[in-house]
């Protein structure tokens, strides 16, 4: 399945925001200042994907979701099914090409907000992605991605409410992706027992060890009852929990994504191409990631989207970021900007030359669009030094510069090579 259109009305700090996806599979980036509402958007999408029944497991205070002083707020997703998506119970999908997931928040009084599905006579969403039929793949990940350190009370949700568990970490920072490591260790036992499922470990190692994924030629070495071990760029062997924050952030996401794909589609469908040495997982679905750039070096930010879209070519990735480098992979996708708090501008899709600068331009071209705020490139001190360099250049041009000033001018030129 894919999200074709999404809209929010009076949700948290957002009065109105709408996204459309003409070509859903690909890399779709949401940018905006701190406090603009990026996390609110991706959480709203995740809430609508799991549905009102599963969402009760969040134990959320629904009054926090409705914008202050508003009587009603809505989240609406228009879902396009894929051939892999099956109905819950008896019946056929019929002529429905678009399925509507719509949630409504209604203020009862100052302290109470009612949360429910917005009724539609055209469909019963519990037969579609809110149901238990196979397919309908979606997951969501928050910015605090790690293997350990979460609240253990949430662990049982992954088993009792697997659909909610697949989206859980986007709703709070106290959720760790511990299930991914436990799953890998269990797969190792299947290897020892020479069971067919044990081949999954070989396929996962192939995928993670592709040359364009981990920096500095780091490699996944071994998965055993003792845990998951990597070899870093210096040749040292390290347990996965001792890797850097950036490594753990991306690896926990990747392992958990694969685990969820296997849960929904099964081993054979997930790895049938990799088993033939075609290194892709071509299944459809929606993957939401808040702050994909968290803890990543700029060089990794630049290529992370290209890696995910290369090896998961039919997934719709919706990610938030503060980095223009993450937008490099949006040649197959879209870029959206939430307006800054207090601004009169409208939130919108970034198109045309502005989009091209973010995808193809250098980092200064990207910041030059001012889509990431006004003049974030240099500090005030740097600006004053540039002005000083300009004055010294004028003196040099007219031959009125002293030796000390010329020495200062050369020093400033070395500092600001890209500006002179």
Predicted feature locations:
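Short, mixed-charge aromatic SLiMs
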Residues: 68-76, 273-289, 391-396
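Extended helical coiled-coil dimerization/tether regions that scaffold
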Residues: 162-283, 403, 419
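Solvent-exposed, amphipathic alpha-helical segments
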Residues: 48, 183, 187, 260, ...
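Amphipathic alpha-helical segments that form well-ordered structural scaffolds
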Residues: 44, 140, 203-211, 307, ...
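Switch/communication elements of ASCE P-loop NTPase nucleotide-binding domains
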Residues: 1-59, 222, 226-371, 376-377
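P-loop NTPase switch/coupling surface
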Residues: 1-176, 195-196, 331, 387, ...
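Acidic, Mg2+-coordinating catalytic modules of nucleic-acid enzymes
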Residues: 342, 352-420
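Short coil/turn segments at secondary-structure boundaries
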Residues: 153, 221-222, 380-384
């Amino acid at each position: 399945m894919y999200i074709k259109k999404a809209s929010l009305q009076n949700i948290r700090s957002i009065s109105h925001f709408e996204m459309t996806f003409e070509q859903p599979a690909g890399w779709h980036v949401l940018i905006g200042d701190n406090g603009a509402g990026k996390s609110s958007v991706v959480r709203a999408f995740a809430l609508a994907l799991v549905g009102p029944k599963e969402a009760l497991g969040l134990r959320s205070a629904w009054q926090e979701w409705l914008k202050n002083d508003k009587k009603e707020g809505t989240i609406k997703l228009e879902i396009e099914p894929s051939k892999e998506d099956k109905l819950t119970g008896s019946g056929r999908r019929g002529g429905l090409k678009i399925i509507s997931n719509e949630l409504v928040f209604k203020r009862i009084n100052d302290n109470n907000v009612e949360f429910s599905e917005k009724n539609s006579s055209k469909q019963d969403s519990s037969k579609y992605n809110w149901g238990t039929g196979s397919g309908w793949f979606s997951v969501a990940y928050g910015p605090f991605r790690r293997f350990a350190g979460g609240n253990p009370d949430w662990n049982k949700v992954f088993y009792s409410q697997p659909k909610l568990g697949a989206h859980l970490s986007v709703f709070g920072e106290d959720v760790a992706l511990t299930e991914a490591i436990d799953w890998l260790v269990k797969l190792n036992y299947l290897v020892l027992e020479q069971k067919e499922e044990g081949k999954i470990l070989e396929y996962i190692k192939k995928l993670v060890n592709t040359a364009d994924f981990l920096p500095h030629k780091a490699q996944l070495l071994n998965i055993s009852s003792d845990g998951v071990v990597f070899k870093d760029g210096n040749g040292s062997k390290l347990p996965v929990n001792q890797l850097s924050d950036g490594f753990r952030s991306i690896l926990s996401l990747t392992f958990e994504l694969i685990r969820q794909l296997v849960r929904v589609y099964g081993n054979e469908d997930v790895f049938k191409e990799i088993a033939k040495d075609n290194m892709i997982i071509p299944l459809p679905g929606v993957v939401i990631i808040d702050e994909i750039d968290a803890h990543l070096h700029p060089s990794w930010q630049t290529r992370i989207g290209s890696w995910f879209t290369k090896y998961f070519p039919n997934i719709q990735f919706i990610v938030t970021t503060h980095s223009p480098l993450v937008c490099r992979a949006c040649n197959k996708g879209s870029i959206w900007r939430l307006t800054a708090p207090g601004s009169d501008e409208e939130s919108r899709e970034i198109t045309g030359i502005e989009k091209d600068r973010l995808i193809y331009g250098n980092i200064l071209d990207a910041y030059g669009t001012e889509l990431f705020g006004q003049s974030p490139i240099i500090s005030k001190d740097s600006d004053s030094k540039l002005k000083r360099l300009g004055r010294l250049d004028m003196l040099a041009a007219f031959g009125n510069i002293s030796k000390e000033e010329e020495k200062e001018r050369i020093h400033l030129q070395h500092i600001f090579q890209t500006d002179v």
